[in-house]
Amino acid sequence: MEEPFLLRDELLVPSQVTWHTNPLTVELKRVSRLAAPMATVTIAQYLLPVISVMVAGHNGELQLSGVALANSFTNVTGFSIMCGLVGALETLCGQAYGAKQYEKIGTYAYSAIASNIPICFLISILWLYIEKILISLGQDPEISRIAGSYAFWLIPALFGQAIVIPLSRFLLTQGLVIPLLFTAVTTLLFHVLVCWTLVFLFGLGCNGPAMATSVSFWFYAVILSCYVRFSSSCEKTRGFVSRDFVSSIKQFFQYGIPSAAMICLEWWLFEILILCSGLLPNPKLETSVLSICLTIETLHYVISAGVAAAVSTRVSNNLGAGNPQVARVSVLAGLCLWIVESAFFSILLFTCRNIIGYAFSNSKEVLDYVADLTPLLCLSFILDGFTAVLNGVARGSGWQHIGAWNNTVSYYLVGAPVGIYLAFSRELNGKGLWCGVVVGSTVQATILAIVTASINWKEQAEKARKRIVSTENRLA
């Protein structure tokens, strides 16, 4: 039974190939149909906390500093972990769907939620002491107090996210991106309304946006849960197999922990970058400029993340279905989208290099500095888009551990030391720090390219078969 399964795409009878029937063209259309909605979804999800910070900032400079600090701390210690762990579902749910093991998909998603909740309790304990932690690290007591209060009201949002992200991956791996699109955009609009109501109508100050974020995440969780429960599209996959629950949790952590390491190591690097900028000769200027560059970079990255999610889904589905060569074509299709997307946004950014800074500041010094760093930012766009796609391949294939080790070597053994050396020893300041990021991304991209090019896709399909179809928890 296994041989036809593994060689399904090799048994297809060749026919005359035209542009419309070319495998790459066909797969490019499929990936694009997933990538476009998912890019919108990731942007909407990214804007939830951004809108909260923007609204909180209208309460004053002190409040903005406290909220920004809380947002940074909670991202590093909580939200990044939740986002990372769920990468396991891109492997497990995606390959199960491709293998038509529909009853396993719901079990994997529910096991992820059950695994996330205890972790949220542990993170919440840490968040309760944020004020004391920040003061012990030398932060201003008043800013620390605001950050601690803001983080406290974000705790419910963490639990909401623990439900939202697994359900999102549950739908994504089945190709159900239109419901994801509508729920994400609806939640964003709801969040704007709740933010305005709590801050300006009820006068809850800078805690209002945090409360709004928590309410919005739970609103998001409820509408996603309702869709999963009542939609006919999920009829085959929303079931729960109790006998597989424990083994599903084990598999979730096997792939989730290295997946979380992949995400967290990357997120944490940029927080270290901002901290280092505060030690430079002109800390106010350097921190402001690097924060602007990081914001621009993140806005682009969430678009690349949408493409990566689409590629991950197609790769995992095809490996689970025993179509290794189609999985390989999915990678090529993702890289084609990367070329178009990164070229477009890099050219756009470079063209607007002298005016984009006005979105953040009116200071000529800041504007000139941002324009000076724009070529490096364009290079980051290209590299990060490339690595995002290949990291999506890693998650879809189930080799998150390689991605985790790659990020450790690329960013912390190469990129960070190079950046610190250029910034402080060579006195390149913020430009030196960002050069370190570019060097680290280059190493990361090179390693990922070598690993991806050397993949034996037939072997990956065999591993997917053993990982998903086996009645026991045989880990590939």
From Swiss-Prot:
Cellular component, GO, one term: plasma membrane
Pfam families on file: MatE (PF01554)
Domain of life: Eukaryota
One Gene Ontology molecular-function label: efflux transmembrane transporter activity
Key words of the record: Cell membrane, Membrane, Transmembrane, Transmembrane helix, Transport
Gene Ontology biological-process annotations: cadmium ion transport; xenobiotic detoxification by transmembrane export across the plasma membrane
Keyword tRNA processing tagged: no
Chain segments annotated as transmembrane: 35-55, 66-86, 117-137, 146-166, 184-204, 208-228, 260-280, 289-309, 331-351, 370-390, 402-422, 433-453
Tissue: Ubiquitous. Highest expression in flowers and stems.
Cell location: Cell membrane
Protein's membrane topology: Multi-pass membrane protein
Record InterPro entries: MATE_euk, MATE_fam
Family under the similarity heading: Belongs to the multi antimicrobial extrusion (MATE) (TC 2.A.66.1) family.
Purpose: Efflux carrier for plant-derived alkaloids, antibiotics, heavy metal and other toxic compounds. Involved in cadmium detoxification. Requires probably a proton-motive force for the efflux.
Protein's recorded name: Protein DETOXIFICATION 1
Species for this entry: Arabidopsis thaliana
Gene name of the record: DTX1
